[in-house]
Amino acid sequence: MIVALKFILVAFVSYFIGTINFSKILSWYVRHKDITKIGSGNPGTMNMLRSYGFGLALLTFVAEVAKAGLTCLIFKLCFPEFGQLIYFFAGLFIMIGYIFPVWSKFKGGKGVACFAGVFLFSNLWYVALAWFAICFVLLIFIDYGCIISFTYIGGLAIGYTIYVWLEGVAYAWAITVIIWVLFALMIFKHHGNIKRLFNHTENKIDFKGKLKKVFCHKKGEQIIEEECVDQKPETEIVIEPKPTNQQTDSEVQKPQDEETPKQD
């Protein structure tokens, strides 16, 4: 009974933490716009990237990763007797809360950043981080974000499943089920992207172009600053006023008066 109550508590708290959507928060308070009404309409990292650029997208991703990962880690520390099981159980309900938030009529984001956060804070964080770096590089060459998302979440799901069985992790079967339920949720939320890929109508993100804008903008600001510092002040040109006709007549008349001798 106590065990059941612990899992119910974790599920309840994790769900409501998952409903916090940082793309909506940042879009509204930074740009004063509703992210669900621009771009693809999806309140997630990729739509933030398409709509606002690299900066806000990165901030959204980091916030979602931290939200999911830290929540799972806290519950694992609170209930250490369940090990990785309680960790991924919390991650599952964070994902459910993010994808089906009660506050938005159960219409939320696709959960890729939350999924990444669950694995980036796990005991295989270094593998998840290395795989993220590889997928980040691939994103420069592949303009379809959903393909990179499938590559990342699929690689993590396969890799962690192999790990729990090879290492004999406790509750390996339950952890495996949770991981693949998470993966199934990802596929379900991306069904529209899959259809558009086959119809050749999927939106491109132009990640390379957005990166160029970021670095070119910074480089341009640096060049302007250097030009302002190195720029020498221009020498002032003083223009003397021309004498008026009255001044010239008096100046001419004065020496003539001096030359004429006085008469007694």
Q: How does the language model describe each region?
A:
Residues 14-17, 94-98, 135-139, 156, ...:
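Alpha-helical transmembrane segments of multi-pass membrane proteins
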Residues 50-76:
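Multi-pass membrane catalytic core of lipid/isoprenoid biosynthesis enzymes
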Residues 24-55, 108, 195-214:
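Cytosolic, membrane-interface loops and tails of multi-pass inner-membrane proteins
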Residues 5-30:
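N-terminal signal-anchor transmembrane alpha helix
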Residues 233-264:
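Long, low-complexity, intrinsically disordered segments
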Residues 33-44, 102-116, 144-155:
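Short, non-helical or kinked segments that cap or interrupt transmembrane helices
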Residues 49-52, 75-79, 93, 112-142, ...:
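Interfacial segments of multi-pass membrane proteins
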Residues 1-9, 70-89, 120-127, 162-178:
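Helix-coil boundary and interhelical linker segments in multi-pass alpha-helical membrane proteins
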